[in-house]
Amino acid sequence: MTWAIVMLILMSLVKIVLTCLPTGVIEWLLGKFEVHAKLSDENASLSLDGKRLEGAEKQKVIDQFNEAIFLEKYYIYPGDEERYLHPENGGTPLVIDTKKGKKDVKLFVYRYDDHIDVVKQYKKKVIAYRVLSESLQKESLSVAGSLA
């Protein structure tokens, strides 16, 4: 009988702790599994066709990327990574080099008329997903205009 009461108290404590986690802990946990992470100006370097973007143009592209809406994640079959890293009709990608924690992450951004494909490469993993950003798709900047 006492074991049942002790177990009930322990289960109640675990339930309370898990359902009342501080906001910082929740944000950290969600950040660990976030596919479309936000970029910061300090950690990101952007290049298009080998030319680095700097200043207001860089900040504008980063803001547009951060405001993009995540649509879906693509499943990449083993051995099929090159098809996503260098698509046939993808054009010239916008390459974003950044850090996520201690890991170096490289993002390839391919612009299409109705969506944007992002291919994230870190260590030996490749993750591809689709986002929607009308400002990044339709922008007449020299950068965004030459992504296609």
Swiss-Prot record:
Location, primary (coarse class): membrane
Protein name: Uncharacterized protein YfmQ
Recorded GO CC terms: membrane
Ranges annotated as spanning the membrane: 7-29
InterPro entries assigned: Uncharacterised_YfmQ
Gene: yfmQ
Cell compartments where the protein resides: Membrane
Species in which this protein is naturally found: Bacillus subtilis (strain 168)
Assigned keywords, A-Z: Membrane, Transmembrane, Transmembrane helix
